[in-house]
């Protein structure tokens, strides 16, 4: 069973709202208030509301059950695909049933020098295991447990760091501080069980009541979770109408039932929806789509000889603006997306690709949430997992299992359901899919796309070795299918009448190499095939058919959207590209340094204008002029220019280091003396504290 965090009310709540008469004339409904932990007197520790995942969906919650760490072991060897160890637990474990135990695992691999290095996502965070492990207990001493963990794919020299955990209790009764309830408001309530009842016959009752201005209490919710409803790992939703408005209202929440089961009952952050003032200009919706691993030069709108993206060409490039020269900051999923969501270069983050709860960097979802947007995300897990910090700011963060055969299909279907459920609200929707990612799987209907004969024609000079051309063909087929998936989603946006009121952004986190510079995949190089990403934008005030050639970065997406929405800027390193849109003119500012990095020994690089520098500790520096050599095949031999570019890189690195140090120091200051030791143990168990 998983324990993480977030919101699943959109479909149920949206249908309830429509059924109750919330028609299109209420198109300016916004989130007027979120009743977070502080409204209920709860200590949030690091400053952000706790997030709890039930099943595939995570939501911010008022109070989460603490995770008790019963045992913590490091250096457990893996032999023949199996890790096994025995530990003596405390006396409280004697009476705990087997299904009350949880297991969290972290992989660590040792290199010859003896240093520990990260091994995939599980090296960054503990990963709670839902299966592939067993707990053995002798009848005469149930507190002495043996754990077996299946690790058939573990790399050589990998050991495990393991925690045996149990879920503690959440508060059973909560009462909010007074708040104002606007006329015609609606409450969105989410509730669920952090784990199924230990007793199959167990049940929990959830009750919500509202008391306003001294009037009699109004019961908003009185539901029991038992049987199949209690065993199902999912959130439950309600959208009650609170009745009369009030100047001073209190929301009272209660969970009751068997002692153990009631302790696992949790409430998502309640939200109050109300109409936006009529005299305030309406805010636009935002849809942000990330097609993981999509390099820009494989889209036909970017000049690729194959028609890989005819639908996006027509629906986005022709109806909006295409940014020709955009780069990521780190060609890996987590760091690239974190730059997208924070507007910060990868080198400025204390841990690239990971946002701790106390690090004072604002995410796009947090900025839009604070502006009254309903926020939802549908991802395909893996390196975009919520535990890395991506779920902060989202009212709903859904992680679908990464299944190659269904990549994209479920994600865009979820996105379409979100649109239908929230068409009368201001929303921010983030969709992420690995559809284009290796192993480049596409449906049989696309088998005839990407003719191998193209390698003797339009693709002859692409620099791809013959042994990699079949991979490129498969990659292009996956892009072509992703193109149709995006188009079907955009058609639903049109059908619902939302297209003219919604900014749509399609981009990626990084590209993909096919041997052009001796590398395959991504993450381990700084050449354009890994860094150059698409950026397509359409919506109000965005010129149709526009093209912007000014070099830009993935960090510019956040400030651009806030600028277009008329929202105040946040402290980010990116800059708004709105000036390149209005009047279809280019940004007039002087070229700015655009730093980036990749996996390598002191690997770092910088783009300044058309000049690009790649530097590592174990290789001579490489200097290119992308204006005359876009494929980076002719390194420049120009000592003066190299010295200048090294100075630019040093300046960019100093700026990143200053921000990184400030963020880390602020995070430590916010952390220190705030969270109790038990909270810190829970954060360690969830992977937030190493």
Indicate residue ranges for each PLM-predicted region.
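Hydrophobic h-region of N-terminal signal peptides that target proteins for export
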Residues: 10-21, 683
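Short, flexible helical or helix-coil boundary motifs
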Residues: 14, 109-112, 656, 690
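Intrinsically disordered and other compositionally biased segments
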Residues: 6, 17, 297-299
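Bacterial N-terminal signal peptides that target proteins for export
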Residues: 2-11
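Catalytic domains that recognize anionic headgroups
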Residues: 21-66, 166-201, 205-207, 211-690
